[in-house]
Design a protein with these regions (language model features):
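N-terminus-centric sequence/structural signature that marks the extreme N-terminus
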Residues: 1-153
Length: 153
């Protein structure tokens, strides 16, 4: 069980960092092993981690991104078939730096349509995936809602 947070604003001047920090602090009981909050131009993403898969790797902490820094992922849950998906991706030439299901989900979302990703992954999950270049995000949860995803527009 982890906690995820994503906020966006029309203008940078609307950001209230104190409220965002307080919001993430409310989620700390969902993920006591690590907590991280990032702020960018007009958005913020946070995560509180309960380390189950790849527990000793700081590289698996979230929000998750790569060297390019275009995409960001905050994810709660477990992808049951991530090892099989990872083997398939490795056979296609994709490189990994962690042993986490988070990175598998990240690479899938970065390279394939959301529809195909949701059809491929099996598990319980909620996530937000942000594309910095397009200034757009995708929020999704598993089909049964085992992992909650609350949002407001």
């Amino acid at each position: 069980m982890c906690g995820i947070l994503f906020c966006s604003w029309k203008k940078k001047s609307q950001i209230n960092k104190k409220i965002v920090h307080q919001s993430l602090n409310l989620l700390k009981n969902r993920g006591p092993d690590n907590s991280k909050l990032i702020f960018r131009e007009n958005w913020s993403m946070g995560h509180t981690r309960l380390s189950i898969i790849d527990p000793n790797s700081k590289k698996s902490n979230q929000p998750f991104t790569d060297e390019e820094g275009r995409y960001f992922l905050t994810f709660n849950g477990e992808i049951y078939n991530y090892k099989k998906l990872k083997l398939n991706l490795v056979s296609r030439g994709f490189k990994f730096r962690t042993n986490s299901d988070t990175e598998v989900l990240y690479i899938l979302l970065k390279n394939f349509t959301i529809e195909s990703v949701l059809n491929l992954i099996k598990g319980m999950f909620a996530f937000v995936f942000f594309d910095k270049k397009e200034n757009s995000f995708i929020a999704a949860r598993d089909h049964f809602g085992q992992k909650p995803l609350y949002y407001s527009i």
